[in-house]
């Protein structure tokens, strides 16, 4: 399985000023549960925004043109994928998500209610017709958060 794991505002925003503009422990716990023991692939700015580096109990991979001490780095997602076994999560940012849309099997999306505006906002890429939208459900009994899955349309597989 290769999946995109993302939290998105109603405006489609995934970040602002190189950070996530909301904090929900239910979403963070879910992120940890889904990614522990798996490979996570991210861009350099996502890596730099992490409060703990590397994220423990996961194989951390950063896509960057330069090397970063303490983490595996590759110049492309394709180069990284050649070294991966098992489940893989693409965890951001926007450029990684854009490229991962052609490589992933699922999009696992948390819908946050927070309205975000202003400058320096980062948006999730457009989800095209190759993806089939699933139902929107409440996330883990959390009153504010919703969850939605997208899978590749059988027509396009």
Predicted segments, located by residue:
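Enzymes that bind and transform nitrogen-containing heteroaromatic metabolites
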Residues: 1-155
